[in-house]
Amino acid sequence: MSNKTILAGLIFCSFASFAQQKSSAGLVQYVKPIIGTQRMGHTYPGATVPFGMVQLSPETDTISYEQNGKYNPDVYKYCAGYQYDDHTITGFSHTHFSGTGHSDLGDFLVMPTVGTLKLNPGTATQPKSGYRSNFSHANEVSAADYYKVKLDDYNITAEMTASTRVGFHQYTFPKSDQSHIILDLMAGIYNYEDKNVWTYLHVVNDTLVTGYRQTNGWAKNRTLYFAMKFSKPFIAYGNRNYSKKEVYRGFWGKFNQSKNFPEIAARKLRAYFDFKTEEGEKIKIKFALSPVSMDGALQNMQTETPGWDFDAVKEAGQKTWEQELSKITIQTKSLAEKQNFYTAMYHAMINPTIYMDADDKYKGLDQNVHVAKGFTNYTTFSLWDTYRALHPLFNIIEPKRNDDMIKSMLAHFDQSPEHMLPVWSNSGNENWCMSGYHSVAVIADAVMKGNASFSTQKALEACVATARKRNYEGIGEYMDKGFIADEHNGV
C-alpha cells in the first residue's frame, strides 16, 4: 500500500469523526500562505480570517490591465496582487481574490514612508522614483492571519492582521520628522484608466477618516465604504487629484482642495497623512470595510476591534483558524505533507467571503440595502470552480456555512434583475464569468445530504426558473430546436 493510499485513508477516517476529535494543538504552524504566490498560483500572503470580508495583503507592482489600448497579458500574473519573484512592495490593500483566473479588487492601498513625500508609486526598475520600497523574503513572515515585512528603503517594519471586517496595521517607524502614511484610492488590481468611477474622503478629525470607492471592473457596479482610524493624531494631511480636467468643476475652488480639507471627492485621489516619529515608535491603523455605508464601516470597527491590542486581534484570528483546521487531522511524519495539507485547507476556507455588516445589513444585487435574517450573507461564488469539490467538502466540515451560502444564493435569486441564481457573483454583483449552470449542483448536493434548512420548494423553483431563462447561453434556442445552432458564449 502506498503512502498516498494510507494518507487518503487517514483523511477519510478524520472526515467521519472530526466532530468527536479534540483540536490538535498548533495546526496553524503548518499554514504557509506564501505557497501559491509564484507564477500563476494567484494566491496572496497577507492576513485574513476564515471567509473574512477583509484580505489585507501586500501588492508588489502596478501592472495595468491595458497597454496602448489593448489587453496587457502581464496583468494575469497579478490576479492576487503579489508575485513572489518581485522585489518591491507598493503598499497593502484590503481586498483580494485567492486562486482565481481573473481579477478585480485591491481596494484602499496603504503605504508608510519616510523622507521626502512621493505620491507616485514609481516603477519596479526605478523604485526610488516613487513611494514603493524594496524588500527581501529574508525579512518577511507569512502566517495564518499575520503578515510581516521590512520595507528596506524606509527602515519600517510593517505588520498586518485582521478580523472579519477590519484590517489591523502596525508600522514600526525610525526617528523622523518626515514620516507619512499614504492612502492611495487610485490603486487597484486589474486596473485601467477609467476603472475608478468615483472616490470620496471625509477627514472627521485628526485620527479618523472615512470614505468610499466606486469602481467599474469585474463587478460592474461596486461601491465599498471604509473607516480608517489612527492610533496617533496626524500633524498634517493633504491629497493630490490625478483626475482628468472636468468640463464642469463647480465652485469648490473657493476652498483649498489639496490641504486641510474636511472632505474631497474625485475620480482619482491619493491622500497622505504626516507624522513625527521616534525610533521604534509604532503607529497602528484600524481599517474597517462595509458594503453599505461609512457609518456601517465605523460600526464594524467598534464591534470587532474596539481597542488597540494588535496581538490580541492576531491571536483571536489564529485561534479561529485553529478551530477550522482542526476539523480534519492527518497523521504523517512529513513536515512538508503537513504544510501542504493545512495550507490547502487554509486556502479552501478563504472563499466564499462574508458580505454583510456586523448588524447583518448588506447591499443586494438590486442595489437596495437588505438584512440577512437568520443567516450570514456570502459573496465570491466562483461556482464553476467550486461545485465539484469545495461545496461538497463544506457539507461535511462546514454544514452551517454551506447552508448559509445557499441561502445567500437564494437571496441573490430574489434580488437579481434577471431572477437567476448566481453564475459567478462577487461584491453583490453578478459578473457572468464562465458558462454553465452550477448553482443547482450545490443546492441538490446539500438537499441530498440532508443539509438544507432553507425552503427546498423555493430552491426548486429558483433552479427551474434559472434553467428556463431563454436569453442565457442559448437556452431559448435549445428549448425551441433541441440544439444550439452556433455558440456565442461570452465567457
Language model: regions and residue ranges:
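Bacterial Sec-dependent N-terminal signal peptides
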Residues: 1-22
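Accessory carbohydrate-recognition regions in carbohydrate-active enzymes
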Residues: 21-441, 445-491
